[in-house]
Amino acid sequence: MQAAWYSQNGSARDVLHVGEQATPTPAAGEVRVKLHTSGVNPSDVKSRTARPVSDAFIIPHSDGAGVIDAVGEGVPASRIGERVWIWNGQWQRPWGTACEYIALPQQQAVALPAQVDDDAAACLGIPALTALQAVHLAGDVKGQTVLVTGASSAVGHYIAQLLTQQGAQVIGTVGSEAKAAHARSAGCQHVIFYKTESVADRIRAITQGRGVDVIIDMDFSGTSPLLGTGALKSHGTVVCYGSNNPGEVPVPFRALLYGSITLKFFLVYDLSPQDRAWCLDKLSSLLQANALQHTIAAKFKLKDIVQAHEAVEQGRLIGNVVIDLTP
């Protein structure tokens, strides 16, 4: 099969290769999916750059969509021909979705409603599931004010939609006018231009000094200083799913303690079985109801995977980047 892979960390141009790899055979409990699309997420390019390579090679990307064409022992043959989307394709294993075929445990290939196309389906495993878990951890947000950092990102756009559906007032941070328009299209009633405005001052103005009830955060290294400014109410909650600084991050401990602030962190690859089941069930319902907007910023063929990774790294596109694996 045709696949893209890397054997060492480095820039996309230096380490990504495209060529032939062995076509996998599904083991017991597995399905093989003929992939139509592969989603490229920021975590994929970060892994290529910095996560130690302990296998002979890594076929990148965890998200994708396609059709089951073979099943292993113990999997009903009736699943052959089923359209599916994939989660955790390359989590703790070297075989991701940047290839023509993937074999993986059958529960990681989820039935896809007919009305959801393959491009949108390549955006579900990380962006949509991260958004669902973040909003789930935020609790009952009806009538509350929620700050979403990175509201125009793939994850942030889904988060803003979900919060709006649940009756929250959503404030989003963005980096440009185009990204502000995208955030508003997801339901953000207010946007803050974090590059040119004081986020804390704008929050206090919007909330008349009360602060927000919840912060759903993509970059704890950037948001941690905000927690000592009164931007978050006492007894407020922070739900965080990432940090641009993966090392130690200082926190305003006194403000957190005396504000009785709740911090909730999670890694979408490592949800508890109960949370994973809840998110998958909720996402299936939303997809059936056509209740989510999906934004595809750019599509590339597998031979152009270097440009796809570079596009994600540059951060200028609005929406998801997808690899088209069809002939």
Region annotations inferred by a language model:
Residues 83, 145, 169, 236-237, ...:
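Short glycine-centered segments of the SAM/dcSAM-binding site in methyltransferase folds
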Residues 85, 213-216:
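N-terminal Rossmann-like NAD(P) cofactor-binding module of classical short-chain dehydrogenase/reductase
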Residues 122-196:
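Mid-domain Rossmann-like dinucleotide-binding core that forms the NAD(H)/NADP(H) cofactor-binding site
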Residues 222-292, 325-327:
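Glycine-rich phosphate-binding loop and adjacent beta-alpha segment
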Residues 1, 289-295, 306-327:
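C-terminal capping/lid region of NAD(P)-dependent oxidoreductase domains
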Residues 199-209:
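Short amphipathic alpha-helix with an adjacent loop that forms part of the alpha/beta core around
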Residues 22-39, 49-90:
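Glycine-rich beta-strand-centered segment in the early N-terminal region that forms part
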Residues 77, 87-150:
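NAD(P)H dinucleotide-binding glycine-rich loop of Rossmann-like/cofactor-binding domains
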